[in-house]
Amino acid sequence: MKPLHIVMENFGPFIKETIDFEQVETDQLFLISGKTGSGKTMIFDAIVYALYGMASTKTRKEGDLRSHFADGKSPMSVIYQFKVNNQTFKIHREAPFIKEGNITKTQAKLNIYELVDNQFELRESKVNQGNQFIVQLLGVNAEQFRQLFILPQGEFKKFLQSNSKDKQSILRTLFNSERFDEIRHLLVENVKQEKVQIENRYTQIENLWNDIDTFNNDELALYKELESSQTDKMIEKFPQFNDYGCKILKSFEEAKNKITKELDDLNHKYKVNVELSENTKKLKAEKIKFDDLKKEQNYIDKLKQELKMIQESKVLITYFTRLQSLKKDKDELVSLHEQSKLNETNYHNEIKGFQKQLEHLSTRENEITQFNQYLEKNQVFFNQLDKIISSYQQKPVIEEEIKRLYSEYNDLITKKEELTKEMNNKNKDFAIIEHYTEEIYKLKKIIDESERQKKDEKLFDKLQLDKSSYLSKLKEKKEQLNEIESSITNIDATLIDLNDKKDFVNEIKSAMSIGDTCPICGNEIHSLGEHIDFESIAQKNNKIKRLESKKVKIRDEIIKIETRIEELNHRENELNFEKQEKKDISELQKQLNHLNQLKDEQQSINKLVENFEKQEKEIVNKIHQFDLDLSRKNTQKEKLEIQINDFERHSQFSSVNDFETYYSHAKKQVETYEYENEKTKDKLNELNNKLKIEMNDQKHLTENLTQTSKEINNLELKMEKEMQQLGFESYDQVKSAADLSAQKDEIEREINIYNKNYQSYEIEINRLKELVKGKKLLNLEELRQSIEKTNLKLDETNSQIATISYKIDNNSNKFNKIKNIIQILDDELKVQKEIFLLSEILAGKNDYKLTLENYVLIYYLEKIIFQANQRLSFMSGNRYQLIRREAISLGLSGLEIDVFDFHSNKSRHISSLSGGETFQASLALALGLSEVVQQESGGITLDSMFIDEGFGTLDQETLETAIDTLINLKSSGRMVGIISHVSELKQRIPLILEVTSNQYESHTQFRKN
């Protein structure tokens, strides 16, 4: 991942700041420089916050990132654009905050865009899904990104010197090694469960074996004493239990068959004798009933004679019945005709009475008409009596209210005139207040500027004084440096190179003779004496070293002085002081006070006028309201007067009660008249209708009476003829025959029942005689007792068979269950044996006394150390390498780091390193960790890295080595940014991102050296 642009709003000291990382060339090393607290580390916080919603270090919380100078309505937000795997993305993350005037936080926002065809397209717009998208895109979580992207202050020194427990916590987060410990825990729990399950299976076998039935056999009972672990012997004894049970079952089944046959014979005998006994009893009873039936023969013969007579006189009886009915009808018709005559006379009398009553009612018609007209005319008033009463009651109240309103209205008019007179010479003037405000602002600005000028002048004078002092020191140090360089130049250095070659010269001398050719210069040797003064050369060499050392020291002092002078110049430029004419601040303050007084006086007048205008407005509003109220009340009064006048004019009453009494009386008179008139007319109509009906009924009755008399005469002639033929002498004989005819159905029914019963008894007696013919009856009680005894014997045998069968089946089921459990147990023991062993190994019971997670973490740590040593060897001049301390102990061992010193050929504790050496080891370890985390996170490549502080502890040579390491790192394809205050880095690093602060807001700018 390579940063391209970042925009920070209300983020730390940055109110609205944009950094363009594209100004950093590919593979370029750059320095981030600025005062302490200017916000250098906040740049890293902004990048990490944009990606993961958190700061670059764990100690900073999201709420700590918001600028204290941000306004209450603007959110904290970061827009971060970067490139990863040749794809360009942009993230806009906005933090939640409590907006000014609210009590709840706003919602966090996150939008992720991808650059496609030179346009950004939205990929995610929800916070949770967006966070997951970023983790999947980069392949690392926030903690891993911190280790890869940023090397924070002191973090890797802590990691280098930490114990195994602390390292485990860090490495566990980076490499997600907790899953290995979870595997171990799962395996341990699995083993525990399996052991419990195996014990449960043995318990199941024991319980099932104890439940096996022995059929009261002593030999089988001995087998029950086998232990649950003796599974092979159990399986061997299973068939013996089954064979013995089947043998007992067979003997009981044979006995059952014998008893069943005996019982069937007894049941058959009992059934035959029960039927014989019942048939004998039934035959005797049927004979008795048949004899009783024969005794009714005479009565049945008499009924047959009566039936014959009824059938022969059927026509005569019909004539007689019809004649009796006609005579009865004739009597009723005579009675009805007489009653109708009487009714006709009564109806005529009633009609005359109601006609007289109707004539009397017609005399009041004019009076009732006048009442009706009055009622119609005043019905509206009668229906609204409550409203009219209310009008009479409201009228004096409204008149009093109008009087009160006129009084208050006049009071308000008077008050308004008094206020107008009081404020006659007072006016509002906001323009003059604005003028005073502008003048006050200008004076305050001049006073503030004068005070600032005074402070700047004082600071400028101090800077000039300090600068002059440092320039004097610089001049002095440069003179000292020139003197030293002159001294070094004046020393004869021609033979200095021979200082360490005395032994070499003596060896050559011992091998040469006078007259030989010199192997160095090629001339003839004339003498072998001492031509070189090695002691003098050594003295000169020591003097040069002292001077060089002093020279380096003075140069360092010169660099520090120049840095201080440069800093003073920078501060002087920032101050940008120019001498100006001094102004009298006390006089300006007097003018300011006078203007404030004038402003306050005019504000008081404005306030007084505003108060008057407010009161005047209230009075005008009240007057207007009184006008409305008076108009409304007068309107109400007019409506009431109109309503009262209408009532009195139409009703001719000034009293509502009198009107109500008269109206009710008139209404009652009309209603009574109309009711009586209508009732009389209805009664006359009803009587006339009844009279017509009665006269019509008389006509029909006369006709029916004539017809009935004629039919009676005809029937009497027919009856006399029929009586002569049948031998009847009187109507009494005919009446007796008619009475007997009514019983015909009952006579026929009795005869039929007798005949049917007679035939049925004959058939049943013959059938029963055949059934009992030639058979002997046995003792039923003795047979029943024999059957009961045999049934008890059979039930007992069946119970024994069922019990034995159940025991055999139950034993068989338990045997099968035991076999299944034994098979499962054997399979589990084969598999779990290896799992038990693996569980112990992963739990630390091994030669290395390491758990699985610690073993994995050691693997990662050794990879990190291998990567770190490639750089540490270079930085330490092949002197140091990191090694893992190997110690065998159960627990969190094996993660401590020692350092191996090739000069002493021994390893030593990491704390024995100096500050600079510790920085070298920490930097190497950090870079190594970064490499390994990248490899383990799916090969994601972070094309950038930032290092925060740590270089101040290094000497010049070590610093150069560290810078070379970082230069090699950036040349491998990374953009490397360094935060540091070390001045040598400013000289060595060509590109600087300067962070400047003006007390409350910071700004950034790239600058090239």
Swiss-Prot record:
Transmembrane segments: none
Coiled-coil parts of chain: 397-499
Superkingdom in the source lineage: Bacteria
Binding-site residues for ATP, renumbered to this chain: 34-41
Alphabetized GO MF terms: ATP binding; ATP hydrolysis activity; endonuclease activity; exonuclease activity
Alphabetic keyword roster: ATP-binding, Coiled coil, DNA recombination, DNA replication, Endonuclease, Exonuclease, Hydrolase, Nuclease, Nucleotide-binding
Pfam families found in the cross-reference section: AAA_23, SbcC_Walker_B
InterPro entries xref list: P-loop_NTPase, Rad50/SbcC_AAA, SbcCD_Nuclease_C
Swiss-Prot/TrEMBL GO biological process terms: DNA recombination; DNA replication; double-strand break repair
Function: SbcCD cleaves DNA hairpin structures. These structures can inhibit DNA replication and are intermediates in certain DNA recombination reactions. The complex acts as a 3'->5' double strand exonuclease that can open hairpins. It also has a 5' single-strand endonuclease activity.
Family: Belongs to the SMC family. SbcC subfamily.
Subunit structure: Heterodimer of SbcC and SbcD.
Protein name per UniProt: Nuclease SbcCD subunit C
Organism field: Staphylococcus epidermidis (strain ATCC 35984 / DSM 28319 / BCRC 17069 / CCUG 31568 / BM 3577 / RP62A)
Gene that encodes it: sbcC
